[in-house]
Amino acid sequence: MTALPAASITSSAFDDLDALNAQLEGLHADQRVAWALQHGPQNAALSSSFGAQSAVTLHLLSQQRPDIPVILIDTGYLFPETYRFADALTERLKLNLKVYRPLVSRAWMEARHGRLWEQGMVGIDQYNNLRKVEPMRRALDELEVGTWFTGLRRSQSGGRAQTPIVQKRGERYKISPIADWTDRDVWQYLQAHDLPYHPLWEQGYVSIGDFHTTRRWEPGMREEDTRFFGLKRECGIHEDI
C-alpha cells in the first residue's frame, strides 16, 4: 500500500473519527505515531505489558519520543521472565518506565478474597479490576494522559478484530498504531531492528500475562485460549477504560 502523506491529515480530523481512521489506514505505523504525537492531546503515554511482542511498540514510540512515559501494571503475579524482560528493554531502549501497582498487596487480597482467579468469571473479573484496571486508570489519571498509545492488534483475538487505529475513550484518545499488523509484520519488524521476543515465546507462550492465568499454546488452540483458562481474552483494561 502506498502511504498517504501524514501532513495532509490535520488536527481537525479528530472531529470525524470514522474518516480519520480511514485516512490513518493509509499510513505506515511510524507515520501514525508521528501524526498522533503532533496532533493528539497533550501528555502522551504508552502502556505495555512487556508481553510476547511488546518490543515493537516500545521501540516504535521511543524512537520518536524517547521520554514518553511507558506504563507497566505490576500485578504482583507476573512471570519472573517478564520482570527481567522489562529490565532488559528499559535499559536497552532507555525507557521512561512508570510502574503502577494495585493498592492492595497479593497477600492481603488473597486473605480477603481467596484465589480470585480460580473463582470463575466473577472472580476473574474482580481480580482483573483490583490488580489491573484500577492501577491503569490511576496511572492514566495521575499522568494526565490525553493520548494513550497501545500495542493492540486485530489479529490477536476475535474481540480485537475491529480495533480502530484511533478511538475516543472519555476525554482521552487511544491510539493503536499497529492495529492492522499480522504476526509476520511483527516478526519482520523485530528482525529488522534486532529486537527480542519475550523469553517465554520460545517455550510456546504466545500471549503472556500473569503466571496463574497464562498457559502455553498447543495445536488447535486459538491465541485467546491461552489466557484465563479459555474463558475470556481481555483483562478489562481495554474494555473498561
UniProtKB/Swiss-Prot annotation:
CDD domains: PAPS_reductase (cd23945)
Swiss-Prot/TrEMBL catalytic activity: [thioredoxin]-disulfide + sulfite + adenosine 3',5'-bisphosphate + 2 H(+) = [thioredoxin]-dithiol + 3'-phosphoadenylyl sulfate
Domain of life where this protein originates: Bacteria
GO cellular component, one term: cytoplasm
Keyword Cell division: no
Subcellular location: Cytoplasm
Major location (coarse): cytoplasm
Active site: 235 (nucleophile)
Protein family: Belongs to the PAPS reductase family. CysH subfamily.
Annotated HAMAP family: CysH
Protein name in UniProt: Phosphoadenosine 5'-phosphosulfate reductase
Naturally occurring in which organism (per UniProt): Xanthomonas euvesicatoria pv. vesicatoria (strain 85-10) (Xanthomonas campestris pv. vesicatoria)
Lineage: Bacteria, Pseudomonadati, Pseudomonadota, Gammaproteobacteria, Lysobacterales
Gene that encodes the chain: cysH
